[in-house]
Design a protein with these regions (language model features):
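Secretory targeting and sorting signals
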Residues: 1-28
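Post-signal peptide N-terminal regions of Sec-secreted extracellular proteins
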Residues: 27-177
Length: 177
């Protein structure tokens, strides 16, 4: 019995140290990764080098669980010599995922947000607003499961002839309870 208790204690300590958030379905609780990844892009020609950053979050409120990805970006140079079209396509796919203890992630809901016009029209965007938030449909919260947000970004740079590039981003910390 003592070995089982110590093993449970050790496992719990590792989980808590790993950044797990505990939730109550009645209270609003969020679990966001400080940074879920970024993409530094050097464009052809005189378009400004830019950094695109992402943050995945999972949220529980009023018995529902939601996942979203925020995207911000900035120029890495002082002046943009060419403000022309930078992308033929820029899409973020956000997934709400669940897992049982010791299991693997299962996608519950997913959505793809087309941000092509927004990233082409704005050389930078640092605000966290609904326009740059890709929100997957919510699901009924089950406190016996672990929940997370995961995402990927797919983009096609105008004029580089490389086609669509897809990058998997780091998921949010797990939310449980």
């Amino acid at each position: 019995m003592m070995k089982k208790y110590l093993a449970t204690f050790a496992a719990t300590g590792g989980i808590l140290a790993g950044g797990i958030a505990f939730a109550s379905p009645a209270a609003a609780v969020s679990s966001c990764g400080e940074s879920s990844g970024s993409v530094d892009i050097t464009f052809p020609g005189k378009k400004p080098e830019s950094l695109y950053s992402f943050m995945n979050c999972v949220d529980v409120s009023n018995g529902k669980v939601s996942a979203w990805t925020w995207n911000t970006w900035q120029m890495m140079v002082d002046v943009a010599e060419d403000r022309g079209k930078r992308f033929t396509s820029f899409k973020v796919t956000t997934r709400l995922e669940k897992r049982e203890w010791g299991g693997t992630d299962t996608v519950v809901t997913t959505t793809t947000c087309d941000l092509t016009k927004m990233v082409n029209d704005n050389l930078g965007w640092s605000a966290l607003e609904k326009e740059n938030k890709c929100l997957a449909p919510s699901a009924t919260y089950d406190e016996n499961l672990w929940w997370s947000a995961d995402s990927s970004v797919s983009y096609d740079i105008e004029g580089d002839d490389k086609g669509v590039i897809t990058k998997q981003l780091t998921g949010s910390p797990l939310l449980f309870g």
